[in-house]
Amino acid sequence: MSLNVVMGNGQHDLRSEMLTMIQQQFCQNELLTVFYIVPNHVKFDSEVNVLQRFSIMNGNDDSELYAQSRLQVYSLTRLAWALMKNTPDRQPDIVEPTGLFMIVSNILREQSDNLPVFSRMQTKSGFVSALVAQLVELRASNVTPENLLEVLEKSADNIFLRQTLNAKLHDLAIVADDFNARMGENQITGQETLIAFAKQLADLKLSNVAFYFDGFNGFTSAEMMVVNQLITTYPVTMGILGDPEKMGQQREGDVFFKPMTTVEQLSITARTAQQEVAITAATKMRPLSRTAQQVLGAWACLGEYRNFTGSRDEVHLNVFAAENPITEIKEVARRIRRSLVDDPTLHLRDIIILSRDLTPYQAHIEAVMSQFELPYFLDMDVNMMNHPLVELILNLLAPNKFQYQTMLAILKTGLLRPTFENKIVSHDEFFDIVSHMDNYLYAYRPYESRWRDFSRPFKLFQVTRDDDDTEISEDEKVNNRLEYLRHFIVEAFDELDDGFAMAKNLRQSVTHLVLWLQKYHVTDALLEQRDDFIAQGNLSRSQQSEEVWQMLTKTLDEMVEIDGERSVSLTDIVTTLQAGLSGAKFSGIPNNLDQLMISEAGIVQNTQYKQLYFIGGTRQNLPAQVKNAALINDAERSIVQPALQSGTNPRYLQNTAQQQMAEENLLFYGSLMSSIGSITLSYPILEPSGQLAEMSPFFKRLVDTFNSEVEVIGSIPSSAASLLKQYVGTARATLSDLVKILPVYGQTAAFKAVQNVISNTMQDRLERVLSAPNYQNNTTKLKPEFISALFGERLNVSISQLESYYSNPFAYFLQYGLKLQERATNELNVAQTGTLYHAVFENVLHELIVKNKSLRDITGDELRALVRQHMQSQLALPAFEILNDSGKMRATTNYLTRVCETLVLNLQAAARENTSKPEAVEQLFGFSKESLPPLSFARMQVRGKLDRFDKQDVNGEFGTIIDYKSNGKTFNWGQAYDGLQMQLLTYWDAAQQSAEKLGVAAIGGAFFAKISPEKTKITDKTDLNALFTGKLIPETFKYRGLFISEPAYVSALTTLEPQEKSAHYPVVLLKNGALGKIGVDAVDPDEFALLLQRNRENIITAGDLILSGYFPIMPVEGGLTYSPYLDIIRFDRALGDAYKVQSPADKNTIIKLLKGGQD
């Protein structure tokens, strides 16, 4: 028996050396079986390569099929399974992460009085998982807390560190002892599989076998135990990186320090077992290109900060710096496309893209590779926590399943679907109704009580049916399907919750969950998803459905086995499931045999690729900045590790961050080894964070050594010639770069040449894309047939619609022409509270009108009672049902009632200033026959509604219009002139033409009444003590608007003495008894006539423009502030869009304009 080590650098073909030795041994011993051990990650590729090369070595053609039973390729874990499969009764049970989490959680709960350190720490998120990981690491390293305490007692390191570690180890020892006792002899963690295998190897008697190890640079503690056991019993041969002439002289920081130290440790083991040790230098060379050979040779020196003395001739190390990560990955894809064209023998499977960290690229890889039509395999772990099944279960176990976000998360998994005729509803049909349910839930946000109140159906659409209707409308069908889905959800949730409530322990809870998933066809939906992915050719995604179900059931089984008889809460179940599934990963399966490999440098790769692209080589990423988050931190590890690693039985904890970073030079060397051909290094100049990035020092050493030119790749070609030379890829990818240089180089020959080639495959797309730079954000006039279809031949509009046209013409087209609307929402906002106040005021005043009373004629208490009465009647309506849904909303209702009382009392106070009396509320004009006539024009008529109409004096000489507003709106002369504020003037005009019907001779004024209280901010200059004690005096209510400056009307509004101002009306008398100007909303009758005429002209102009199809993108400044159409309008002043010029707000200036227009 012996330990044979074949040692060489990355230029040597260690595999060929060992296969030659195997061939010789086969000739010498016809009964010999060789177990060829490789790292697990490259097991399949290595098996194919080993057998192919061995076949050729034995004289077979490389195209012939070859089988060999005496040469078997395994990973260590597969070897353990192969050798131990015939002794299942001796194999310990493996406890999965879920079980470990439960065991440790139970220990912490039961031992809390004995764990002073851990009792404080376990309240921190993730502590239990960190403790589990630490216990697993100690067991896998064959180290106990007692071992660490012994080392600590002998240490002379930092006293404070020793004290803190001692306290931590004290608690860890208690937990570990209890943990080991509960695990017993027949249970192990997944990381201890190889340790168990190593122990059983001692009893295993194999004859005529030999073991070969290939591709390892070092071993974990568990792997080392297996290797040591094999060395003591069987012949072992190992191919490993290193320099045999420097054995024993290696130092930390050397590129080959780790593998050579590993050989040194194995040699001690072999000699202790009386085995021969032979370390030989490899002589066979890999078929490397000149570049790959010299780069490997250079890094062996440069990685140790030694000068490279080898030849630099004919080394073509490609290096480029890209503007950003997206440009970088696009450039790599472009170069790969070019390589495939230049070399017909090159396949995608011959190319690998590596990065130390793929995170900055992960979100862009799919889009870029699709654009360049490159099939690829992303060799990264995919976490099971993001799978729809896990998402479904965790949300089903959440306490508030009926909340909007949780409900949508459940429905959008597509796994919980109702059935129809014993079949689950199809995917498309289900998601169609889910989209409607989404709209309903978003609009109304129903509480759980509302979900369960089936007497109040879910209605997304309000449908009115005539008695003679025989067909159900589409809107009604949607409402019916919503109700069906609602009943299904409530029934399913209730059955789930009832089963959990009846369960007496964890076993019954888990059993109920699985049976519920089967009863409600979640398993069937999961199988349907799998089949759909198979049909799409996505084998990787299809297997995930099976893997996640297997992992879930395995996790649940583990939970029941360990703690099945204990009574647990749903919170405990969720926490345990999250712990068990958080580390679960899907096994990646390539969808194609020929595809590009994209992986990270920290993962073992095969060494047969013809091209290597190492991306993301910035100072920040390479060498990697490692952080250790283990329970025993790096400083504490540095105290105990030297003693653990010494002696004849060395043991190893996880390396510290510093030790891991010291191995980065070896990791980079292994990455360079993956290519036998070309090597391309790249990095982004700009990090995703926006910060400038520097080239990695690893890259820089190679670049400086070989004087490599660093090509700078911008996101935009610098010229047409540059496009032709550097940016040509697929037609689609090239087109995206072509359009970027169109404005400058569109007429050059190179540009035309590329354009002509693209036009052969995608002419329509080419024309559309190349026209993009000439795009102007302008609209064109609608065709007459479209105008007629959208607006009819004659307009029938409200004045607020015309105001919106002047504010933003294109938004008017979107809202009233195309009928585009935001998603409805039933949230309590300013608009909705304003509507509520408005409705209460209307009903209160209507009751007073019926009783022929005014606000002055009743007491404050009577008025409050009226407000409360009509508030209750409004709350019974569907529009305000949200205010009855919860205690919080009922408290809000009480607040709104008090506010409403205050506002009505404000109106009462103003009414006491004169003898006015409300005559009508919600007075319509331009609607039904009972309403007042509309304002009619040649091609349109204007309709509207007067919130309140008062008879201002007892003789009925004057009438006053009141319009309720949530904000403190005032009359703006400039906006009235521009058509932006036409409401008061139009209402005045409509009321004046129907003055006789309204019972007055003329309209004297129109005012805005603010019906929302002003909010006081803490930042406002105010008395904070009064604010916090509720004694802050509220603002004084005041009407603002416009009135005729006739003395009779002014006297009807208020009775004032000279130098006095009205408390509630915009009226001030000067010393001489005349009307003042500041704070007075008066207008001369002649000037008012001009203003009214301008208003009519604005109405006619707006109607003519609308019916001519003129909807320019020319909003007034502020017209886009609350617009829901910003994403459609795309207004951008930097790109030439302009606001409409507004007139000044000054009254005198506008009057001059009005008189000038008249002249």
Swiss-Prot record:
Q: Which UniProt keywords apply?
A: ATP-binding, DNA damage, DNA repair, DNA-binding, Exonuclease, Helicase, Hydrolase, Nuclease, Nucleotide-binding
EC top class, as a word: hydrolase
Task: Decide whether keyword DNA damage is in the record.
Answer: yes
User: SUPFAM superfamilies given for it?
Assistant: P-loop containing nucleoside triphosphate hydrolases
Database matches in InterPro entries: ADDB_N, DNA_helicase_suRexB, P-loop_NTPase, PDDEXK-like_dom_sf, PDDEXK_AddAB-type
Keyword Membrane assigned: no
Q: Which Gene3D superfamilies match?
A: 3.90.320.10, P-loop containing nucleotide triphosphate hydrolases
Cystine pairs: none
* Molecular function terms from GO: 5'-3' exonuclease activity; ATP binding; double-stranded DNA binding; helicase activity; hydrolase activity, acting on acid anhydrides
Its Enzyme Commission number(s) read 3.1.-.-
Q: Name one GO biological process term.
A: double-strand break repair via homologous recombination
Cofactor(s) listed: Mg(2+)
**Signal peptide, first to last residue:** none
User: Note on file?
Assistant: Despite having helicase-like domains, this subunit does not have helicase activity.
Q: Family per UniProt?
A: Belongs to the helicase family. AddB/RexB type 2 subfamily.
Subunit details for this protein?
Heterodimer of AddA and RexB.
* Role: The heterodimer acts as both an ATP-dependent DNA helicase and an ATP-dependent, dual-direction single-stranded exonuclease. Recognizes the chi site generating a DNA molecule suitable for the initiation of homologous recombination. This subunit has 5' -> 3' nuclease activity but not helicase activity.
> What is the protein named?
ATP-dependent helicase/deoxyribonuclease subunit B
To which species is this protein native?
Leuconostoc mesenteroides subsp. mesenteroides (strain ATCC 8293 / DSM 20343 / BCRC 11652 / CCM 1803 / JCM 6124 / NCDO 523 / NBRC 100496 / NCIMB 8023 / NCTC 12954 / NRRL B-1118 / 37Y)
Q: Which gene encodes it?
A: rexB
